[in-house]
From Swiss-Prot:
Its main location: plastid. Its EC number is 7.1.2.2. Belongs to the ATPase alpha/beta chains family. One of its GO terms (cellular component) is chloroplast thylakoid membrane. ATP binds at residues 172-179. PANTHER family: ATP SYNTHASE, ATP SYNTHASE SUBUNIT BETA, MITOCHONDRIAL. Disulfide bonds: none annotated. The gene is atpB. This is ATP synthase subunit beta, chloroplastic. The keyword Kinase does not apply. Keywords: ATP synthesis, ATP-binding, CF(1), Chloroplast, Hydrogen ion transport, Ion transport, Membrane, Nucleotide-binding, Phosphoprotein, Plastid, Thylakoid, Translocase, Transport. It holds the Pfam family ATP-synt_ab. It is a peripheral membrane protein. The modification Phosphoserine is found at residue 13.
Length: 498
């Protein structure tokens, strides 16, 4: 059991027990601290500066040691604003890395990078804490079986399946349903896998973090009446925070997720929004520490930092962490070092399409642009693979024919092409699905569709068995039986109108 430095003994007793240094230099969020000879703190140790500024306001700044400079000095990066600090102030070496609360007490709460609650709901139980710096699981602990992580979302499970313990890149602009998809995944992992989720908001807008929290409360993902029944813990280090906080908030979220995997032996979903901001913060810190920049001004340690984070996200024999990472691509340049380094770690990509969202097809996952390394016959089986390939071929042919249809109309197509278009439109609509978390907005009950049901449904559409049914019957339904029932209802309604 470890004690969190941010919530430990009173200041006086800390000073008696701990190593004391003094601030020698302040350059923005970077502090140089001098310690007595032979009492240098280790790399990654937490340092705490306490005192009062010139206006009498209390100061409590936590820093992390990054470099040992010689002459009994260390260079540390602050995790909060350094206003009010001055040379000569006392600095306490906590003797260990930053530690954050873990376990069930974190569910339904919002934390900052230090593991302090920022939601005004009172203190958190800090009896169980864990350091944010750890090594990745040893090779012998890893679960090397390739298994699909079933989400209950048809378009994902069929065309770009997630790997259990894998990493998925989520690409999408504003307003195409990224938040709703994230919340549905959080909901489904809790119901189908008995798992929990951790959301790491890394360097994104505070407004978006607040909106997500409000929507989670509205949709029941966070249970205000009984926080222990919530399905997610939130960790935020937003745009306005110093680079140190933005660089470490991903590790704080990951540490909370690791506890659920290793101690509670659960399947965990870890969301990182946005992984690019993690790299960006590392770049800022690197420059402040005086390192020579690498390509495009990024830090020379880019691959190492990314690898250290990503290698901890994996399946072990006890449980799994499956990570979904929103990826911002600067200037849409996929060769930029930040997204290029991220791609090397991804097992699947889920691309959200504005065109599909405009058509009202939700989730607006692009079936042709989304990819997965799991979609191989030896992993998913011949039936799944063949069905997915046929669906993609049909949709691709429809995409090719759209220009001809726009100019000449459907009637100018061959009989075979018209049949392909009709089936593709049914497939496109059948890829939509009502979500549990959207029930409060749409009034339609959410649907969880198992993988076997999904494959059966698309095989029947491709076989031509439902060529006679109207395409509206396939829109926003769960499995194929609901589509046939909806078609019967539509037929009865049209007869009554006549």
């Amino acid at each position: 059991m470890r004690i969190n430095p941010t919530t430990s003994d009173p200041e006086v007793s800390i000073r008696e027990k701990k190593n004391l240094g003094r601030i020698a230099q302040i350059i923005g969020p970077v502090l140089d601290v001098a310690f007595p000879p032979g009492k240098m703190p280790n790399i990654y140790n937490a340092l705490v500066v306490k005192g009062r500024d010139t206006l009498g306001q209390e100061i409590n700044v936590t820093c992390e040691v990054q470099q040992l400079l010689g002459n009994n000095r260390v260079r540390a990066v602050a995790m909060s604003a350094t206003e009010g600090l001055k040379r000569g102030m006392d600095v306490v070496d906590m003797g260990k890395p930053l530690s954050v609360p873990v376990g069930g007490a974190t569910l339904g709460r919002i934390f900052n990078v230090l593991g302090e609650p920022v939601d005004n709901l009172g203190p958190v139980d800090t009896r169980t804490t864990s350091p944010i710096h750890k090594s990745a699981p040893a090779f012998i602990q890893l679960d090397t079986k390739l298994s699909i992580f079933e989400t209950g979302i048809k378009v994902v499970d069929l065309l770009a399946p997630y790997r259990r313990g894998g990493k998925i890149g989520l690409f999408g602009g504003a307003g195409v349903g990224k938040t709703v998809l994230i919340m549905e995944l959080i909901n489904n992992i809790a119901k189908a896998h008995g798992g929990v989720s951790v959301f790491g908001g890394v360097g994104e807008r505070t407004r978006e973090g607040n909106d997500l929290y409000m929507e989670m409360k509205e949709s029941g993902v966070i249970n205000e009446q009984n926080l222990a029944e919530s399905k997610v813990a939130l960790v935020y280090g937003q745009m306005n925070e110093p680079p140190g906080a933005r660089m470490r908030v991903g590790l704080t979220a990951l540490t909370m997720a690791e506890y659920f995997r290793d101690v509670n032996e659960q399947d965990v979903l870890l969301f990182i929004d946005n992984i690019f901001r993690f790299v960006q913060a590392g770049s800022e810190v690197s420059a402040l520490l005086g390192r020579m920049p690498s390509a495009v001004g990024y830090q020379p340690t880019l691959s190492t930092e990314m690898g250290t984070l990503q290698e901890r996200i994996t399946s072990t024999k006890k449980g799994s962490i499956t990570s979904i990472q929103a990826v911002y691509v600067p200037a849409d340049d996929l060769t930029d070092p930040a997204p290029a380094t991220t791609f090397a770690h991804l097992d699947a990509t889920t691309v959200l399409s504005r065109g599909l969202a405009a058509k009202g097809i939700y989730p607006a996952v692009d079936p042709l642009d989304s990819t997965s390394t799991m979609l191989q016959p030896r992993i998913v089986g011949e039936e799944h693979y063949d069905t997915a390939q046929q669906v993609k071929q049909t949709l691709q042919r429809y995409k090719e024919l759209q220009d001809i249809i726009a100019i000449l109309g459907l009637d100018e197509l061959s009989e075979e092409d018209r049949l392909t278009v009709a089936r593709a439109r049914k497939i496109e609509r059948f890829l939509s699905q009502p979500f549990f978390v959207a029930e409060v907005f749409t009034g339609s009950p959410g649907k969880y569709v198992g993988l076997a049901e999904t494959i059966r449904g698309f095989k029947l559409i491709l076989s031509g068995e439902f060529d006679s049914l109207p395409e509206q019957a396939f829109y926003l339904v769960g499995n194929i039986d609901e589509a046939t029932a909806k078609a019967t209802n539509l037929e009865m309604e049209s007869k009554l109108k006549k």
